[in-house]
A protein has these predicted regions:
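Sec-dependent signal peptide hydrophobic core
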Residues: 10-15
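A short hydrophobic/aromatic micro-motif that marks alpha-helical segments and, especially, helix-coil
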Residues: 17-18, 114
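C-terminal segment of N-terminal export signals and the immediately downstream linker at the start
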Residues: 1-5, 20-54
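Mature-region segments of soluble proteins
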Residues: 45, 49-52, 67-163
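A glycine-rich, hydrophobic loop/mini-helix early in the fold
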Residues: 63
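Second-shell loop/turn segments in exported
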Residues: 32-38, 54-60, 74-82
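Short, hydrophobic/aromatic alpha-helical segments in well-folded domains
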Residues: 2, 6-9, 131
Length: 163
């Protein structure tokens, strides 16, 4: 057998194996791999809409453009206790089925402290906190909006000292 042909076939087979997990994922699943929380594509889209209400697109990219809803999903899955994850999911359920104007109204009311239940308050607290955290630590903000110094608080030997 020709060595080039064998190497070519092995590379094609390896590429197919690398793509296999994405093809086996069921339709309607979340686009981020989650271990502890179960979300579907509709809930992921809803999180994206809520994040976009929290940080809308202006002259800078909004939350959806930066993928902050994916960050929130991963943070809730990895960093929160199971009871907080359950409260997050039950709070998210209250936002399902709302049209965009009703969704915005509900987010404004919950942000003003007029939530119907503690689960909704817990959901919105986590959602807002992690959305802002993700925005401030996003690549766009850290490279375009924050002045970066290689060595922060450098030594200034000529600083005037009053005696």
């Amino acid at each position: 057998m020709n060595r080039r042909l064998a190497i070519k076939q092995i590379m094609i087979f390896g590429g197919g194996l690398a793509l296999l997990p994405s093809g086996l994922r069921a339709a309607g699943k979340a686009s981020v791999w989650l271990n502890h929380v179960r979300m579907d594509a509709a809930e992921e889209k809803l999180l994206g809409e809520i994040a976009e209400i929290i940080i809308p697109k202006t002259t800078t990219p909004g939350a959806k453009d930066l993928g902050l809803h994916l960050f929130v999903m991963k943070m809730v899955d990895d960093c929160y206790k199971p009871q907080d994850q359950k409260r997050f999911m039950s709070g998210l359920a209250a936002f399902k089925g709302l049209d965009p104007t009703a969704l915005k109204e509900m987010v404004v009311q919950v942000n003003a402290g007029k939530a119907e239940s503690d689960d909704i308050k817990a959901f919105f607290r986590i959602m807002k906190q992690q959305t802002i955290n993700g925005y401030l630590n996003s690549k766009y903000v850290m490279t375009n909006l924050v002045k970066w110094e290689l060595v922060p608080a450098r030594y200034n030997g000529y600083f005037p000292v009053k005696s």
